[in-house]
Amino acid sequence: MHVQANLMIKPSDNILTCNVIPWFTNFTLLFMIISAFSMCCGYYERIKSGAITPAKFYAKRYHRAWPFFAMMVMISFAMDPSWSTFCQSFADLTMCFNLLPNPNIEVIGVGWFLGTVFTFYMLFPFFTFLLDNKKRGWMVLLLSLVFCYIAIVYFGTPDFVVKPIDKVNIIYSAPFFVAGGIIYLYRQGLKSWVERHWMIALASCLVLTILRFVVDIKGLFILPDLLVFAAWLMYAIGSKDIVLNNKVAKYLSGISMEIYLCHMMFYRVSSMLHLERFIHNNDMLYVATCLTTLIGAICFSHVIKYYVFKLLKKACTKGKFGI
């Protein structure tokens, strides 16, 4: 999606390039649901029982997300040093930049998603309280949808904010995080049902996805995407098919955050190759640019995560840097 939006030479117009690919930007909403579900798997019971301290909980969150993001911020600042990029880089490095009233950060622009998710991490103990039981969880989901709607149509006007409220805002994104938490509360029953009726579950997901594109959804604000992405996660919980359960999917999921954060850097690298000099078909040029961007991002993410960071961690453990 980002490649298509930034390409000077656009691919031909069709249902794929005009409707489907632009919708890929909403996958960040799916990742919010998955983030909430995975956080609940790891910390929901531990937070409720007090089995983990705040220091350990937040240290783990920084340890997981900060190193690679910080490296990308440093690279971006080095490429374009200025007072503006310094201020934005500083905000990025705190991981708290979504607490700003109108965060419009261009240094690692795609990092807005990480900022929103990290705000969710900050609120996770409160989130655990809100989802203390299934009944309360449904009530919270309903209230979050109402609050999201009010935020968009009332508080999202120029009288209150500089720009409309969107995915960057935690109130807008809250229903997706809550949905992930509710799916966690029902995980055992969902897993059992999908395992027994996987064809019905898969067909339901496909129908919902198709309806998302063929039905007029204006006026339904976030509900269509919420239903589609929640359905796919519920299917994934009990799915045993090769599409979602294979070595490639498992490998890519391990570096998905890194790929997301660095892919625009490799789009710029791909642009420097001037592939348009060798490929004169616009559609093929788009495919080639996507492939070079994706391959570069995957290779870079793999090397940094599994080699560079491991070597640095090993060196620090041995005290080579006096730590």
Model-derived features: positions:
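Aromatic-anchored segments of alpha-helical transmembrane domains
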Residues: 1-4, 78, 96-100, 143-156, ...
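Interfacial loop-to-helix transition and helix-capping segments at the boundaries
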Residues: 16-28, 103-116, 154-179, 209-232, ...
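Transmembrane alpha-helical segments and their boundary/interface "anchor" motifs
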Residues: 21-34, 41-80, 84-96, 120, ...
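Membrane-interface helix-boundary motifs at transmembrane edges
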Residues: 47-56, 83, 127-138, 185-197, ...
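Hydrophobic alpha-helical segments with transmembrane-like composition
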Residues: 76-84, 93-154
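Alpha-helical transmembrane segments of multi-pass integral membrane proteins
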Residues: 78, 177, 204-310
